[in-house]
């Protein structure tokens, strides 16, 4: 009878046990270089063996029974959490292996069940350790890869959104290291757009706190953060699931004033993204009085400004149609005001 675990002849239980022991050695501060080197080697070897069980090799496909055993061993031993907690102690290639193992195990399904998602729901600290990974440059991008895989699953996205730690994203997207800030923004955007109903519920329940933090991003000194935040704001407001949030946002005069200022930003790209938020205020058929007052007060200036706004975008038909429509809407405001008078 052929041995089910291939060339290595190591069962999933052995691999997990060896890996856990080697990680425990690396966790000790006072070990000799020789011991650390040996433990690092063992960690690498066992991570590769684990990957072979999950992904198979050129010669053979992954075996369901071995994968199931490995997953169970990872849950029972707590090793999944240990690998995340000690990610900094693992070498460069090993960090990539951990992310691949984690994401593979996370995607695993039995019928309609996703056992690893259920497991992480009971071990929520794993999510928060991944999130905190953005504070450590050497593991930030690995943690981002695992975090986004978690967010694909609604129960895990909900845990993060409703946590206090979610608000750490407002710091992470402003980090000075471009790669890390961009990665954090990609994760932040995923959280707010992947599960539409969940995001809408979150934004409705936490509107004031979320948007007071979000406004700081729109004032950011960092061009990329400012532009990405403005673009995402436009997407959030125009998503039909967020109708209640959009209605509330475009009823506030301070938000309109901010967009009018951003229309005159020194960056053309920022101006362009601001235009896509500004148009929602103008196109709204049920404008609040404070919004109407601002538009009427600046009516002539706005018509003149929009008529000349980025006129070199001749190829962009939709933009030009929208601009023409906004000019007409703003021009017609006067008539509406006069008729009422």
Curated annotation (Swiss-Prot):
Task: Say yes or no: keyword Isomerase present.
Answer: no
Q: Where does the record say this protein resides? A: Cytoplasm
Q: Which GO terms describe its molecular function?
A: calcium ion binding; protein kinase activator activity; protein serine/threonine kinase activator activity; protein serine/threonine kinase binding
Record's keyword annotation contains Signal: no
Give the Pfam families listed for this entry: Mo25
Source superkingdom: Eukaryota
What are the annotated GO cellular component locations? cytoplasm; serine/threonine protein kinase complex
- GO BP, sorted A to Z: cellular hypotonic response; intracellular signal transduction; negative regulation of potassium ion transmembrane transport
The family database entries (SUPFAM superfamilies) matched by this protein are listed as: ARM repeat (SSF48371)
Q: Provide the alphabetized UniProt keywords.
A: Cytoplasm
Spell out the InterPro entries in the cross-references.
ARM-like (IPR011989), ARM-type_fold (IPR016024), Mo25 (IPR013878)
Its job = Component of a complex that binds and activates STK11/LKB1. In the complex, required to stabilize the interaction between CAB39/MO25 (CAB39/MO25alpha or CAB39L/MO25beta) and STK11/LKB1.
> What binding partners and quaternary form does the record give?
Component of a trimeric complex composed of STK11/LKB1, STRAD (STRADA or STRADB) and CAB39/MO25 (CAB39/MO25alpha or CAB39L/MO25beta): the complex tethers STK11/LKB1 in the cytoplasm and stimulates its catalytic activity.
Family membership: Belongs to the Mo25 family.
Q: What is this protein called?
A: Calcium-binding protein 39
Q: Which organism is it from?
A: Mus musculus (Mouse)
